[in-house]
Amino acid sequence: MKNTNLKKCFTASLLGIITLGGYAQVNYVEPPIMGWSSWNTYRININEELIKKQADAMISQGLDKVGYHFINIDDGFFGFRDEKGILHTHPQRFPNGMKGIADYIHSLGLKAGIYSEAGANTCGSLWDGDKNGIGVGLYGFEHQDANLFFNEWGFDFIKIDYCGAGQQLDLEEQERYTEIVNAIREVCPRNISLNICRWAYPGTWVSSLARSWRISGDINPSWESVKYIIDKNLYLSAFAGNGHYNDMDMLEIGRGLKPEEEETHFGMWCIMSSPLLIGCNLTAIPASSLQLLKNKELIALNQDPLGLQAYVVQHEHRGYVLVKDIEEKRGTVRAVALYNPTEETCSFRVPLSVLELEGTTRIRDLVKQKDERSVTDFIQFDVLPHGTKILRVEGERRMEPTRYEAEQAYLNQFDDLGKRKRGIAFMPFETASGGMTITNLGGHKDNYAQWNEVFSEQGGTYQMTVQYIPAEKKEREISDRRLEVTVNGNMTVADKLETDRSKGVAQTTFTVNLQKGYNVIRIGSRFSWSPDLDCFTLTPVK
């Protein structure tokens, strides 16, 4: 392949390599994909006519008009590999082959997605007894299948699963997915949207390979499943952005959830910038579910040109307040979620200062699509069990932030695979400022927490107070605990730290210099462990 083709392929993926590890401003990023996928309702029981009917329904239901453009064919289309290793589709389910179905989808003005497996055998072969899924994965056929999927058949998206690669071959995730993506880049003349499906956040390497990645096990149409996935994604906002997204899995709208649960499901997927892939039968979707899926004001949060994921700023009474900028970075308009995962009504009282806003503030309920009364001090709502208020909030002025939570940081060596004996992780702690800390920080120069957008209106000298949790006495390294705090490359070391955990949250204070605008602050310890980190605050020195 010529280099010109390689440059065209995966340009969106390459965009985020630098910016996720260090600050950079962008004016526009490619938003999460929107469409329909076959797996939730049909699993491997798909065929050519079924896919065409769903594509037709996408148009007839008007979903394409609000942004749903992908028709993704998941597991179940495989037939076999012949003696030359060439992949064939299922002769009964797809008698006219996959190029014909991709062409049909394209003829409707839509985009076509396909599925494969990083190993040899598909998830359908393991979990659904599909013998046609044996030996049809990408393992050993990376270049050949990539050419078939994208150049011969013409697909625009691929989801790459990990059942055969992980459960059978025990391959290492980063190495295996890098091998596959490199093969696609070598043969692909187009920008393919790629999804990595490892059922847990796989590591910070993923943003250089994929546009989206799964962060949890498969969804199902139950409140417990929706709640579980939201919980998994609450503290992953720093790992999304610049056209790369945490995938909360396909939507279960229209598959039996209660109305308030559907509103929470769709609203949280939107404000957290997950891909929006409908998973129900579009020819039989309830009217209320269809109306929700076509809510342009919620969709606008998901497709916002900033491409940000909402993050937690307040946690009380077991409810969560999440916020993100929309329309303009550090502007006066923000999206807010008041999320109640509990079995009781939750009363939210959110000071405007928590949202970094002040002055008369206008509020719009995006689910109900109606304006609420303006406020000048705090936002207050009662939210029913399993419910969520999704709000557009517009203040008069934007305030300079003073508190940065540990759980909002980019953790350079974080993953959720559970393979590391002592990997950096999120750890609940009741008296922490947000009820959450990060643990197993430090011990290596690369095992740090970093805040890439610490903002100062004017710059100057600040008092920085770091709150932390003293180590347990049983931990042998307790006397060696230290914090190395680097501000725009300038390091301050705090090594005389509290060692009595019974005293609760401790703190250490020093002065730092911030530049006007955005600053990068990194906390860790190169040669010893750091204590569990709660947050830090910044106060200008007058």
Regions found by a protein language model. Give the residues of each.
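Structural recognition of the beta-strand scaffold that forms the well-ordered cores
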Residues: 28, 32-38, 67-74, 111-116, ...
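Extracytoplasmic
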Residues: 346, 355-363, 377-380, 386-542
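Catalytic cores of secreted or luminal carbohydrate-active enzymes
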Residues: 267-313, 385-412
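Aromatic-lined carbohydrate-binding/catalytic grooves of carbohydrate-active enzymes
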Residues: 50, 54, 58-167
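Glycan-recognition surfaces
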Residues: 141, 175, 187, 191-281, ...
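Carbohydrate-binding surface patches
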Residues: 269-272, 277-279, 316-357, 386, ...
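Glycan-recognition and catalytic regions of carbohydrate-active enzymes
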Residues: 277-342, 420-442
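Bacterial Sec-dependent N-terminal signal peptides
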Residues: 1-25
